[in-house]
């Protein structure tokens, strides 16, 4: 009997279901093609015939997007796998679950859905009101009395892929106290669909070339190079200014950075700019980098050879400069007037006097170049820098033309360089006779010398320097010892301490008047009178030493002690060695 009652109940339920489907089909003929009936009527779940928006329709459904924070204020529902009934059906799961528009009925989940491959979904179909796929059962819902349910609030707007919409059916005040999201985030404003993510984070434009050139003109070389690292693209004029700035700065680090940016530019094949790079590295005393740039140049001109030879000569490598000159002639390049000026500079560096005269003769005889004033001055520089002052003076007098003031001025500088005071005074007189305006220059007060802020003393001290002396140190030491015995003999009687003889001689060297004279000679120009004031009586050894010093350096030394003034001139004192 119980089995018959179960069959009747099932048949009665099917009749009601068939009537509902026929009514829905007659109301919306366009949906008739979307219905598919399988062998049993239980394949159509009643849930798909409802348009109610349950709060947990997205739960465990991979096809629907995740709802926002305020659309899931209720805890997840649990269902009995056997009875398929909600264990929390006595508790409202959403604000609209027991509304009058739903007829006060709890939706039942039964049957199989052909949309899911014949399997029953855990919570029924997806709701179009909550961003899911459109259900196949559109139109009027028979469970709502044949009318479409009306929901209070506006239809959610879908602004983008993030589905940042607000469900007006669920109010913030009705959120359940049983469930709190772990990470509550504020809803983000919708982003326009035609706005790309790259436009959200705007990148600052690279610095302009004018900014780099402006910093170079203000001598802010480091800041200018930092703009290159930030993406500035210098043009040809900007590279010229950068190379000149690095050459004046004499900083190898900055020069290499600028050269790296130059190699990445489109001007790396410009011969003029490459010549400036050679000159820049030569000023920074980096001959290796200058030679590397010179070797990698495809189109070398005469300026390239001249600049490389000058870089060798300025850094004391005159032999390499002369070898480069021979290599240039082997390549078939004909030297010009400027070429021989660099050759004379290289000869002066290595002391090649004979070689300089040979090149001077070949310039006239072999290459047909008429010597100019610059070439005669170049040969004079070879003689003067090597210390052959007598030969240099005779060379000036044997010139085929009347010497100008430039020759006598150069000769005066060479005499001052080697400490020949008499020759220096004589050359200055000849210079003034030829050009009286030269004498006026010394009377005009000159401005204080500029501070060389561009020079990095730490960098210059880290270089390896090589010094050469033409005489042997042993012979020079013997000569100095011999002169010491003839010219000056320390008088140790004025040392009252009980120490040995050598210590007494060392103690005499640290008397205050001697230190003052040494400091004055270093800091003052030649032949300037020095005045030393002392509060004690000058000792006899210092008195004898100052007389000899006044004759050697050619100055007038005035010493004031607690007794009187001592005027030392030409090895004599005004006191007559009595004070």
Curated annotation (Swiss-Prot):
GO terms for molecular function: mRNA binding; zinc ion binding. GO terms for cellular component: chloroplast; mitochondrion. The keyword Protein biosynthesis does not apply. Residues 485-579 are annotated as: Type DYW motif. Keywords: Mitochondrion, Repeat, Transit peptide. Pfam families: DYW_deaminase, PPR_2. One of its GO terms (biological process) is embryo development ending in seed dormancy. Residues 1-49 form a transit peptide. Belongs to the PPR family. PCMP-H subfamily. This is Pentatricopeptide repeat-containing protein At2g15690, mitochondrial.
């Amino acid at each position: 009997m119980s089995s018959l009652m179960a069959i009747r109940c099932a048949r009665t339920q099917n009749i009601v279901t068939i009537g509902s489907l026929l009514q829905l089909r007659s109301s919306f003929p366009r949906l008739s093609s979307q219905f598919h009936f399988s062998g049993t009527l239980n394949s159509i779940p009643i849930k798909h015939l409802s348009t109610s928006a349950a709060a947990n329709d997205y739960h465990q459904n991979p096809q629907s997007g995740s709802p926002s924070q305020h659309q899931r204020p209720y805890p997840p529902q649990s269902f009995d796998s056997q009875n398929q009934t909600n264990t929390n059906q006595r508790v409202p799961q959403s604000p609209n679950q027991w509304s009058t528009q739903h007829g006060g009925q709890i939706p039942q989940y039964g049957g199989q859905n052909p949309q899911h491959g014949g399997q029953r979904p855990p919570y029924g179909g997806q709701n179009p009101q909550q961003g899911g796929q459109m259900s196949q059962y559109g139109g009027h819902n028979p469970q709502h009395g044949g009318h479409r349910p009306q929901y209070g609030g506006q239809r959610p707007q879908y602004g983008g892929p993030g589905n940042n919409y607000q469900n007006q059916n669920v109010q913030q005040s009705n959120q359940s106290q049983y469930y709190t999201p772990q990470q509550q985030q504020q809803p983000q404003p919708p982003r326009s669909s035609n706005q790309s993510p790259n436009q959200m984070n705007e990148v600052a434009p690279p610095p302009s070339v004018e900014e780099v050139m402006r910093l170079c003109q203000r001598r802010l070389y480091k800041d200018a190079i930092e703009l290159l690292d930030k993406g500035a693209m210098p043009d040809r004029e900007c590279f010229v200014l950068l190379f000149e700035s690095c050459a004046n700065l004499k900083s190898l680090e900055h020069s290499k950075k600028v050269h790296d940016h130059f190699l990445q530019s489109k001007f790396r094949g410009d011969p003029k700019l490459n010549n400036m790079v050679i000159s820049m590295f030569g000023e920074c005393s980096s001959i290796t980098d200058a030679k590397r740039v010179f070797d990698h140049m495809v189109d070398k001109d005469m300026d390239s050879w001249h600049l490389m030879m000058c870089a060798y000569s300025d850094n004391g490598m005159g032999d390499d400069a002369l070898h480069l000159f021979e290599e240039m002639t082997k390549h078939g390049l004909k030297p010009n007037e400027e070429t021989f000026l660099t050759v004379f500079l290289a000869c002066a560096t290595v002391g090649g006097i004979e070689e300089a005269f040979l090149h001077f003769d070949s310039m006239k005889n072999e290459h047909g170049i008429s010597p100019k004033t610059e070439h005669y001055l170049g040969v004079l520089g070879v003689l003067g820098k090597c210390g052959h002052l007598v030969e240099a003076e005779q060379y000036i007098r044997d010139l085929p033309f009347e010497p100008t003031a430039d020759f006598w001025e150069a000769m005066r500088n060479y005499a001052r360089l080697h400490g020949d005071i008499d020759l220096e005074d004589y050359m200055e007189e000849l210079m003034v006779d030829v050009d009286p305006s030269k004498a006026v220059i010394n009377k005009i007060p000159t401005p204080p010398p500029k501070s060389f802020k561009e020079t990095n003393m730490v960098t210059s001290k880290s270089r390896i320097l090589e010094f050469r002396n033409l005489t042997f140190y042993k012979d020079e030491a013997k000569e100095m010892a011999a002169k010491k015995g003839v010219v000056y003999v320390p008088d140790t009687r004025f040392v009252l301490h009980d120490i040995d003889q050598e210590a007494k001689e060392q103690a005499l060297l640290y008397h205050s008047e001697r230190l003052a004279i040494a400091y004055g000679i270093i800091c003052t120009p030649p032949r300037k009178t020095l005045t030393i004031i002392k509060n004690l009586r000058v000792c006899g050894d210092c008195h004898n030493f100052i007389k000899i010093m006044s004759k050697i350096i050619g100055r007038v030394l005035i010493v004031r002690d607690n007794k009187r003034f001592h005027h030392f001139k030409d090895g004599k004192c005004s006191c007559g060695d009595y004070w």
